[in-house]
Amino acid sequence: MKKIITLALVSAMALSVSATVFATDITPETSGSGKMNIIYNVDPTYTVTIPDMVTLGTSADVSVSNVVIAKGSKVVVKLTGTSGTNNAFTVKNTEGAELAYTVKNGTKNVNVGDTVLTVNPESATTGSATLNFNAPDANSIKYSGTYSGTVTFTVLLENA
């Protein structure tokens, strides 16, 4: 019985011994080659710049720079909302009067949900879009005051 217990303890100790792996040593007595793993980690990064204010009747540049992302991906900037009722492009004054405005990306009208800028690092690591925030028609203005509102942009990584 003692021999069985001793054998079991020796076996358990042998299984618990760890082996250290060293780099390959090549000496004059040995020949061959050795391999070494090389690792370099690049974290994803990009910068999106959206102005914090624009005056109707002027433009604003939205830009993406320093794009380093996963292969097969692209940075997408979308206009995804407004402070207007039902996401309408409207601004209000303190008394609640509303004025409608439009947004254009070049000659194209921008609607809520539209992509305004895409940067794919396969072709460029920077990009910009000039959005024109067109003032309301002068004939539609009835009340004075300072009108304000917001637009919301969403930045996504999508498959290229």
Where do the protein language model's features map onto the residues?
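Sec-dependent N-terminal signal peptides of Gram-positive bacterial secreted proteins and lipoproteins
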Residues: 2-23
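N-terminal small/polar-rich segments of proteins
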Residues: 22-96, 117-160
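Short, solvent-exposed S/T- and G/P-enriched segments that are highly enriched in secreted/extracellular
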Residues: 109-119
